[in-house]
Amino acid sequence: MTIRLLCYVGFYFLGAGLMEADIYQTPRYLVIGTGKKITLECSQTMGHDKMYWYQQDPGMELHLIHYSYGVNSTEKGDLSSESTVSRIRTEHFPLTLESARPSHTSQYLCASSE
């Protein structure tokens, strides 16, 4: 069983549950085989220009991995990341990993602000 667990990468997301929210992440939970490409979607309905992706390992602090201050404007954050982002519309800020690995297992959080 331990060997099988090492063959999968888990992604956990902060979700709004049944509460009304203005920012959404999908999928909410994801378990995927190593080497697979994944895209984590983040969308917001508030028209905010600024959007952020954070990564948090269990028991550790949040690390900014990517941010955007508007359409076609993306920057890498504090944490060196193998992920990429795009921002072709104000309301969307997807995060993509080309090849998932066990070291990518973490909680990924999306945020936005004015």
Curated annotation (Swiss-Prot):
Gene Ontology biological-process annotations: adaptive immune response; cell surface receptor signaling pathway
SUPFAM superfamilies: Immunoglobulin
InterPro entries found in the cross-reference section: Ig-like_dom, Ig-like_dom_sf, Ig-like_fold, Ig_V-set, TCR_beta_variable
Top-level division of the source organism's lineage: Eukaryota
S-S bridge residues: C42-C110
Glycosylated position list: N72
Purpose of the protein: V region of the variable domain of T cell receptor (TR) beta chain that participates in the antigen recognition. Alpha-beta T cell receptors are antigen specific receptors which are essential to the immune response and are present on the cell surface of T lymphocytes. Recognize peptide-major histocompatibility (MH) (pMH) complexes that are displayed by antigen presenting cells (APC), a prerequisite for efficient T cell adaptive immunity against pathogens.
Protein name, UniProt field: T cell receptor beta variable 25-1
Lineage, opening ranks: Eukaryota, Metazoa, Chordata, Craniata, Vertebrata
